[in-house]
Regions:
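Nucleic acid-binding interface residues in structured DNA/RNA-binding domains
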Residues: 1-116
Length: 116
């Protein structure tokens, strides 16, 4: 199976578009859902290139520790406006606000939330 940039980007955007209000997902979780768990950094690269006018809720994507994008000062405010609270460390509690448990539930397919 060949990884094409366009299909990978489309899959990333598709997943991010489905992250509900008040919830977050990590770069690695997106990569896993696409079926390419080793491409978390590429997910970050793709999202960094997303135009702000795209309408994607990119602010709902955090790193594996729940940390925010360095230098993106608006991200925290956007998440707080959705009711997400932060730990003293500045991280999002992934167990509380992460979407993966809802999506994967009882052993659902890793590609479960992709709706094309």
């Amino acid at each position: 199976m060949t990884l094409t940039t366009d299909s990978f980007q489309d899959d990333v955007y598709n997943i991010v578009a489905q992250v509900p209000y008040g919830r977050v997902i990590t770069y690695g979780q997106i990569a896993t859902l696409i079926g390419r768990p080793q491409t978390a950094r590429l997910v970050g690269y793709v999202l960094h290139g997303a135009a702000e006018a795209s309408g994607l809720p990119c602010h709902r994507v955090v790193n594996a520790q729940g940390r925010l994008v360095p230098g993106w000062t608006a991200q925290r405010g956007l998440l707080e406006s959705e009711g997400i609270e932060f730990r003293l460390s500045g991280c999002v509690d992934l167990r509380r606000y992460g979407v993966m448990d809802d999506w994967l539930g009882n052993g659902a397919s890793a590609r479960f939330p992709l709706q094309k």
